[in-house]
Amino acid sequence: MNTRHSGNLLIILIVFITTLLLLSAKSDGSLGSTNILLLGAQFLGIIGAVLFSLSFVLSSRARFVEYLFDGLGDAYKVHHITGAIGFIFLINHPFLLVLKAFINGSSTAMYLIPVGPVSYSYGIYAIYFLLTLIVLTLFIKLPYNIWKVTHTFMGASLFFALLHVLNIESDVSRNMVLGLWVEFFLLAGGVAFIYRLFLYKKVTGTYLYKVGHFSAVGEVFNLTLFPEGESIKSSVGQYAFLKVLNNKQVSKEEHPFSIVEINEMGGIVFSVKKIGDYTRTLGNLKSGDKVEIVGPFGIIHKKLDAHPEPVFVAGGIGITPFVATVEEALTSGKKVYLYYSVREPAEALYDERFKELAEKFSNFKYKLWISNTRGKIGAQNIQQDINDLSKKFFFVCGPKPMMDSLKKQLREKGVKSDDIYMEDFTLR
């Protein structure tokens, strides 16, 4: 079974068990006598706290998360979903309590203003930190370094949520199993937050490099970095997070880029397209600039090992994780198909390299696809070379619309979802 399904199923199982534990906590007959608004508030608060905590674990970049979700890309997608649902649930937790108090003619202040019991105040602080973060993220355009600092508010929110759970008189405090279950996930979220903030670079591997060769070809920067000390050890198709340290003209943001190769001189090669504000500032790099590299990440090499006839489809700069991967697959005797789609021939940076491989290896089927003259590449074009697409494993990397469209077409041609691996880097 595809490991990303394991991760998704685990999330669903955790929510299911949490719901059962909450219901079992009311097995004494209190369920029937519990106000429906109070029951809803309890459900939203407990499930929301668990999902919110899990979102920290999913964004920690821990190795087990990468393998459990078939790569950090899928883990981050689930992180965004669990975080969003958890946030909505947590925000509506006090809303239902306020509504209940209003209907009963009771005071609503204790749910909105931290002036009542300290256990309630902890919960209010947690919500305030969450709301502040949402306002800063959605309505105020902040520089990246400031935006990143504001995300410590999430840690503060989690901390106060834990204090709220530990001190509030509720089913969580009265039922030991439910209490330990919820507290475990809150603590796990806290540990993940601390790990991501202080430990992950040390555990994963951090390396100091300097800029050696730098050139621009059209909209693409070709960058070769050389180690200042220990060098990174990576497998084909992997990527790393780069951060420029000492050039004030380049943002100190940390971004993931595919490792094209590690050359014979020990230099690590990247090809980066000028897409957003950050990548455009890379044009200010100069020889000798210091660059921090964290990694490597990525599991393409593990997927490659399991499939004897891989099909690679790359769009534009999406070719970068496949350059060394294709050569590795050919050297190991696999029959390899590569479709390299670019708008015009000048964008095909690695065309000559692949042509040389096609001359060298009879087990290599290579096709350069010029979309400006032939239109976008689709499953029907690939099917002209491969009759039964359903028996192949596909690696796809490129612009998201291209990947989504191709996946849909391949699925319509009978290719299983588990046999399509899409590499993307939406990791913020």
What spans do the regions from the language model cover?
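Membrane-helix interface/capping segments
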Residues: V57-L72
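FNR/FR-type flavoprotein reductase catalytic core
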Residues: G7-I11, V15, G45, A49-F52, ...
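Membrane-interface interhelical loops and short amphipathic "cap" helices
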Residues: S27-L39, N104-Y111
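Alpha-helical transmembrane segments with an aromatic anchor "belt"
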Residues: L68-T82
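Functionally critical transmembrane alpha-helices in membrane proteins and complexes, commonly lining
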Residues: I36, G40-F56
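Canonical alpha-helical transmembrane segment with a positive-inside/aromatic-interface signature
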Residues: V177-F184, I194-A216
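Ferredoxin-reductase
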Residues: V203-K290, P308, V342-E344, K355, ...
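Alpha-helical transmembrane segments of multi-pass membrane proteins
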Residues: I14-G29, F56-L58, H93-L96
